[in-house]
Each structure stands twice: as structure tokens, then as C-alpha cells.
Curated annotation (Swiss-Prot):
The active site is at H67, D112, S206. GO terms for molecular function: serine-type endopeptidase activity; toxin activity. Transmembrane segments: none annotated. Keywords: Blood coagulation cascade activating toxin, Complement system impairing toxin, Disulfide bond, Hemostasis impairing toxin, Hydrolase, Platelet aggregation inhibiting toxin, Protease, Secreted, Serine protease, Signal, Toxin, Zymogen. PANTHER family: KALLIKREIN-1, KALLIKREIN-RELATED. Gene3D superfamilies: Trypsin-like serine proteases. It comes from Protobothrops flavoviridis (Habu). This is Thrombin-like enzyme flavoxobin.
Amino acid sequence: MVLIRVLANLLILQLSYAQKSSELVIGGDECNINEHPFLVALYDAWSGRFLCGGTLINPEWVLTAAHCDSKNFKMKLGAHSKKVLNEDEQIRNPKEKFICPNKKNDEVLDKDIMLIKLDSPVSYSEHIAPLSLPSSPPSVGSVCRIMGWGSITPVEETFPDVPHCANINLLDDVECKPGYPELLPEYRTLCAGVLQGGIDTCGFDSGTPLICNGQFQGIVSYGGHPCGQSRKPGIYTKVFDYNAWIQSIIAGNTAATCLP
């Protein structure tokens, strides 16, 4: 029965890509409750303050942005509304955290990826299921889905009760360079959004997935302030370039390094 529900949820996710890109994380529409079973909420263990998002990639592992690291945080899986709990929500602590050992700590954009091992495996359910690592790199022009509990207004931050979703496009790096002269090829990032502005991830969407043509291709990393500016699309960590590192860590090779 759980398998049937998981397959149904994945179908909803696929259908979401057929929608027009009129849904905004900034001032936009709520995600369907069944389209994000892999979405994880990271929050401060003491205050309960929401910190970041993440993505469940198997029963024991979550992928997020390195800049989301915090001393004391918990992870909530299977969540949708902050006020109304799903019956199958589960909470986990980080058992181990892995950041690329060759990351330049003074560069936020460099290797902005963190792999978290949960203190115990989660049980898959109607609202909890993984998102697989990408089998191939994304193509420029791909339709991509963004989602998160981050701000839905660009300047004065306004946070929604449920995650908001939007469709954007994967852009050529050349189109992003004018807005981000600090962006270097070795940062291994993707650029995605709408060049005229108005559709974007925003504050506290960090760590959430960029899903292009159904594949987990990026992690929300960086962007302009205020959010949604023209010529300033979002910057995402390119997950495909870290596949080998992720798989090595999960297999037990905790000394593995990322590509330069």
C-alpha cells in the first residue's frame, strides 16, 4: 500500500512540470501536499526556528547546503503545514555530517553541499519517500521545479505555513555571469530562474532541491537580494558533480574528497 502511495506521489510530481511557470515561491502558490515527500525541514533544536530545507535521498541520508550547517538542529520529514501535522511526520537528529574536506571555507559558493546521516532510518509512508540522485547532468532550457518554506515576499520577509512551489528554467552560465561576476567555474553550480525576474527562491529556501525534468539536479545555494531581481537568477549547487563523493560517503569511505 505504501508503494502505491509513493508511486502516486511521484506521478503528481511529474505532472507538476506540465503547469505553466505562473506559480511563484515569491508571492506564489502552495505546493500540492503530495508532491514533496522527499522535502526535509531543518530547524533549531532549542528555539524551534526554521533554518533550511533538505532532500531525503534514502532512508538514512539527507542532502542540503553546507551553509545550512548549525550546531544544534533537528530534521522533520513528511511535513507540509507548520501548524497542522501529518500523521506520518517523523523527526530525526543528525548522527554524522559531511562537508567536502577540500571546500574553501571562506567561499560560500564553493562546494556548498552537506550530506547528513540520520540517527535512525526513516520509514517510508504517504508523505515520506526519497528523491534519487541524478543519472545524467541537466540540459540548458530544462523545466525545473523549486519549492520551500522560505520567504514569499522579496524584501520584507514573509514566511508561509506550507511550502510554495514554482517552475523555472535552467539557464546558460553565460546568462548569469553579468549578475554574478564572483561566480567561478570551479564552484560547480547551476543557474536557474527567469531572466526578467519575479520567480525565484528566497530567504530560508536554502538547501531545498532543484528538480529538472524529474531529476534532483541542484541545491538552493545563493541569489540576489532582494530575491527575484531581473538578470539575477538563483544559483544552485550542481548535484551531479558530487554523485561519486556522495556514494563514497554512504558506502563508508568517509575520507572521500570532492572534485576540485
